Design a protein with these regions (language model features):
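Conserved catalytic cysteine-centered active-site region
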Residues: 1-5, 17, 54-107, 118-120, ...
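Buried hydrophobic positions in well-ordered alpha/beta secondary-structure cores of metabolic enzymes
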Residues: 7, 33, 44-47, 89, ...
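Short beta-strand segments
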Residues: 7-8, 108-114
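Short polar catalytic/cofactor-binding loops
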Residues: 9-14
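Metallocofactor- and cofactor-centric catalytic cores in central/energy metabolism, strongly enriched
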Residues: 20, 24-27, 43-49, 55, ...
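Short catalytic helix/loop segments, enriched in acidic residues and glycine
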Residues: 20-37, 68-73
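Phosphate/pyrophosphate-binding loops at sites that engage ATP/ADP/AMP, CoA/4′-phosphopantetheine
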Residues: 31-45, 169-172
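Conserved residues at the C-terminal ends of beta-strands
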Residues: 50, 83, 111
Length: 172
């Protein structure tokens, strides 16, 4: 493996952007990152696009990165979509690092984008529920719906499934 450096970074300010699309949020961060690296899209060899919930919130499945990057000058290059729940962007960054470290690419781009707001507040909540082990919930509760499966007062379905012993979760 060879040494790798991060040549540039960019970020859209965290916040709620009800009228913005993932594409518009990505364009802002991408423009900043490429400018910081002092390169253009032509110099990028491969892209790793991290996103977990776009399909559930917008209906856009399978080609989320390709759609978000349509106007970026990156189409025609490999755009690999990475879905790994809350670690999607971190996983994309790891894969970009590995691509350069292994010699597969000289310049790789990692992008993470998520928009967890929706006019119907139950939609992002359902997206978070989809990140739970639904098969395990069914086996333990007999319910197909984690919202109605029930938890003890002061607890959540996440605690029932993922906290293996009392006190396993730190006090907040």
């Amino acid at each position: 493996m060879r040494g790798v450096m991060i040549g540039g970074t960019g970020m859209t300010r965290f916040g709620k952007y009800p009228d913005a699309s993932i594409r518009s949020l990505v364009q802002e961060a991408l423009h900043e990152a490429l400018g910081d690296a002092r390169i253009g899209p032509a110099e990028v060899e491969t892209v790793f696009f991290g996103n977990a919930a776009a399909g559930l919130l917008t209906g856009q499945e399978m080609i989320t990165g390709q759609v978000a990057l349509r106007d970026s000058g990156l189409l025609g290059k490999p755009i690999i979509n990475v879905e790994n729940a809350c670690a999607s962007a971190s996983s994309a960054a790891h894969l970009a690092w590995l691509s350069v470290a292994s010699g597969q690419a000289e310049v790789a781009l990692a992008i993470g984008a998520e928009k967890m707001t929706h006019a119907d507040k139950s939609v992002p909540f359902r997206a978070l529920i989809a990140a739970m082990d639904l098969e395990e919930i069914r086996a333990e509760t007999g319910s197909d719906d984690p919202l109605t499966a029930g938890s003890a007062p002061g607890r959540s379905g996440f605690m029932d499934i993922y906290a293996e012993r009392p006190g396993a979760l730190p006090a907040v």
